[in-house]
Swiss-Prot record:
GO terms for biological process: translation. The keyword Lipid metabolism does not apply. Keywords: Ribonucleoprotein, Ribosomal protein, RNA-binding, rRNA-binding. It comes from Neisseria meningitidis serogroup C / serotype 2a (strain ATCC 700532 / DSM 15464 / FAM18). Belongs to the universal ribosomal protein uL24 family. This is Large ribosomal subunit protein uL24. The gene is rplX. Pfam families: KOW, ribosomal_L24. Transmembrane segments: none annotated. Disulfide bonds: none annotated.
Amino acid sequence: MNKIIKGDRVVVIAGKDKGKQGQVVRVLGDKVVVEGVNVVKRHQKPNPMRGIEGGIITKEMPLDISNIAILNPETNKADRVGIKLIENEGKVKRVRFFKSNGSIIGA
């Protein structure tokens, strides 16, 4: 189980976009794409066969997962994530929790 998944609110803790907040759009192994963060301009070549217009486009590039931290909604601060096992009706389930206060993420 990954500590950061799609849909999490995160804050950038290192790099040129330090302090910016956003939502995780995609997780790519040890990198994540965050909405509105690490935006770059790229030149797009037109391709009429695929219906792609040419020009300069802006897109979000992946950030290393070590440069972001999940945002705790209770404290509105960056927090660390832990994983613990919870037994429910004989089944063991892995859940993520905030290390600062122990509250379960997404519950």
